Regions:
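Positively charged n-region of N-terminal signal peptides that target proteins for export
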Residues: 1-4
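Bacterial N-terminal signal peptides
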Residues: 7-16
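Secondary-structure end/capping motifs
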Residues: 231-318
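Bacterial lipoprotein signal-peptidase II cleavage site
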Residues: 16-29
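Short, glycine-/small- and polar/acidic-enriched structural segments
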Residues: 28-171, 183, 187-193, 204, ...
Length: 335
């Protein structure tokens, strides 16, 4: 099972993808010169990437001498393009970066933007589920055996003294998994905690158990290639400064403005959903994803080596990676 899981996870996170353009030589910007850089972001343009958009629209990148272009792709493609220099920065999920580094792909995390993972067990309260031990004999939906959420489910069950054999796992596509919960096809799903608020907003009485309580992990992180970092530490530092300023602007009571701007200029498909997205920023991103005890002590985007190592050990234990790496090889706290 572990071997099959490794193959599936590798296909999902590090499949072969074509580059997004020819590799360009990266040269540091001269004083007062605007340097053009690009970042490839996980998935598609959504208002949850508001800090990036705020940093551009408010001129925070420009203040740092940067002109930033946004591109979007799957996590595996992002890691490869960053490593080869097709783009200077990437914003994939943390698990894909750990997998890439364990396979020798030369990338580093320079901003642990999401201080916690997004995974959660979501259930209808009528199911009788209140804690992990209540899952015995229940139907649990996951998107695939190769998904990070499947690992989260395994760890959650193990911590409760059970195994995957104690539940009935159903594989359901991303577009159908939430409806499967609402319709009663399954008793619970391992999915994104953002859906909890969306369901409550729709009048569905749901609860959640966040997977981070059992498996320390991270969501999206900022990465660069080793070569680019070695030659352009000042550029990386400037990008970090602008990104963190964008996050702080939203934290300081400007979530509504940030969402409205993001939807208008970058994510028009979210038109009409600004209110719920603002609620999600206020209730999940600001207090939980962007901030932690570590960021309070060390600043936004701080990378905790011990916590990263805990995530790496679990991925090794469950066969996601074959070679365990030290977090110090992966992270760099760039000020």
């Amino acid at each position: 099972m572990k071997k099959l899981f490794l193959i599936l996870f590798s296909i999902l996170t590090l499949g072969l993808f074509s580059g997004c353009g020819e590799t360009k030589e990266n040269t540091p910007a001269k004083k007062d010169e605007i340097q053009k850089v690009s970042i490839q972001i996980d998935g598609a343009a959504v208002p949850y990437y508001a800090p990036m958009y705020i940093a551009k629209e408010k001129g925070y990148f420009k203040e740092q001498g940067l002109d930033v272009d946004f591109y979007y792709a799957a996590a595996a493609e992002i890691v490869k393009n960053v490593a080869t220099g097709n783009v200077q920065f990437g914003f994939p999920n943390a698990d894909s970066v750990i997998l890439a580094k364990s396979q020798g792909i030369p990338v580093k995390v320079v901003n642990t933007t999401y201080q916690h993972g997004l995974g959660a067990l979501i259930f209808q309260k009528s199911s009788g589920i209140t804690e992990p031990k209540d899952l015995k004999g229940k139907k649990i939906g996951v998107t695939s055996f190769g998904s990070p959420n499947y690992i989260q489910l395994q760890v959650m069950l193990e911590k409760a003294g059970m195994s995957i054999d104690d539940v009935k796992v159903e594989i359901i596509g991303t577009g159908a998994i939430v409806n499967a919960l609402v319709s009663g096809q399954v008793d619970a799903i391992m999915f994104s905690m953002l859906r909890t608020i969306e369901l409550k907003n729709q009048g569905v009485d749901v609860g959640e158990i966040r997977s981070d309580e059992f498996l320390p992990s991270y969501g999206n992180v900022l990465i660069v290639g080793d070569k680019f970092l070695n030659e352009n530490k000042d550029v990386v530092s400037k990008f970090n400064t602008a990104l963190n300023k964008g996050i702080q602007y939203i934290i300081d009571g400007n979530a509504k403005e940030a969402v409205e701007m993001s939807v208008e200029k970058y994510a028009p498909s979210f038109k009409g959903r600004e209110e719920i997205v603002t609620t999600i920023l206020d209730e999940v991103f600001i207090p939980y994803l962007w901030q932690s005890e570590n960021t309070k002590k060390n600043g936004l985007g701080y990378s905790d080596a011990e916590r990263w190592n805990n995530s790496i050990k679990v991925l090794k234990e469950y066969g996601v990676i074959e070679k365990e790496i030290d977090a110090k090889e992966l992270i760099g706290n760039i000020k």
